[in-house]
Amino acid sequence: MTIMRKTHPLMKMVNHAFIDLPTPSNISGWWNFGSLLGLCLILQILTGLFLSMHYTPDTLTAFSSVAHICRDVNYGWLIRYMHANGASLFFICLYFHIGRGIYYGSYLYKETWNIGIILLFLVMATAFMGYVLPWGQMSFWGATVITNLLSAIPYIGSSLVEWIWGGFSVDKATLNRFFAFHFILPFIIAAMAMVHLLFLHETGSNNPLGIPSNSDKIPFHPYYSYKDLLGGAALLAFFFTIVLFFPDALGDPDNYTPANPLNTPPHIKPEWYFLFAYAILRSIPNKLGGVIALVLSILVLALFPLLHTSNQRGLMFRPISQTLFWILVSDLFILTWIGGQPVEPPFIIIGQVASILYFTIILILFPIAGLIENKLLKW
């Protein structure tokens, strides 16, 4: 008798994706982050669903409804802090996942990589709109500043901004539509993640050595299913430590003040996971130039497959490229720090140098290092 999981139309799909999937025998903990991102997404959709039952997308009551959730709803405080910190956790996993892709050359699976970039844009849009919903000071001013960037687009800019706002400023219409989009986007992200997985399973996973592993594959279950469970348990332990002991560590105190269009906060800044891009935006004195640099800071990831010059796939045996990779990581930490600082010396020049270094490493130094390493290995 044939096994049901191999014949049933629905179970067959699950079987091919999570049970009998041939997987390289040597993939490390860095390959855990895909499943951890799936866990984060499920967590965010569930907590978000329960929050939406008590939240009201109205300028007069939004802030109060969040306070009501924290004070009067059973475990509302827990759901709210899980959702708020879940976003941070999502981005931590996302950045590790992208870093792994760059380090081990996974970007050479072009379809998977490009869908990943689209997913990154979708997650960033969702997080930005979610940050606006509590209608605190930083919510309101963050929404005003970021949406205003679109006015830099020539000719249609100001009309586009007013169209997005639904009026002449960020107001009730804006909050309402942001809530609608914030609710629907995670489901679109889930669908895109399935497409991401579909394309990955066309080629099979990469591995730390960056060599074909068809001669040495093992079934995903039980080996990697249990490895993912361990990763998930570690992630949840870390997550609940933050949620239960330091729930406000990653947030902005300004968001505990209700939105006031007449009072601008001294330092308008986004959540920590956008600070590197915000620093790149601010380091260019021209508005349109800044917006282009902001978009390119993420879109530059799409150029990785085109700029790959090495005859080896990953950075495992390439010390020059490894050094550049870790300088790039350090540079991103510097940009994140600068994004949270006021626009004054010496932060301006540090931000500008770090921004130039970011693009220089990716666009110029990585390809040159690849060619040098080929030469050194006489390939």
UniProtKB/Swiss-Prot annotation:
GO terms for biological process: mitochondrial electron transport, ubiquinol to cytochrome c. A ubiquinone binds at residue 201. Its cofactor is heme b. Belongs to the cytochrome b family. Component of the ubiquinol-cytochrome c reductase complex (complex III or cytochrome b-c1 complex) that is part of the mitochondrial respiratory chain. The b-c1 complex mediates electron transfer from ubiquinol to cytochrome c. Contributes to the generation of a proton gradient across the mitochondrial membrane that is then used for ATP synthesis. This is Cytochrome b. PROSITE patterns: CYTB_CTER, CYTB_NTER. The keyword Heme applies. Its main location: mitochondrion. It comes from Perognathus amplus. The cytochrome bc1 complex contains 11 subunits: 3 respiratory subunits (MT-CYB, CYC1 and UQCRFS1), 2 core proteins (UQCRC1 and UQCRC2) and 6 low-molecular weight proteins (UQCRH/QCR6, UQCRB/QCR7, UQCRQ/QCR8, UQCR10/QCR9, UQCR11/QCR10 and a cleavage product of UQCRFS1). This cytochrome bc1 complex then forms a dimer. Heme 1 (or BL or b562) is low-potential and absorbs at about 562 nm, and heme 2 (or BH or b566) is high-potential and absorbs at about 566 nm. PANTHER family: CYTOCHROME B. The gene is MT-CYB. The chain crosses the membrane at residues 33-53, 77-98, 113-133, 178-198, 226-246, 288-308, 320-340, 347-367. One of its GO terms (molecular function) is ubiquinol-cytochrome-c reductase activity.
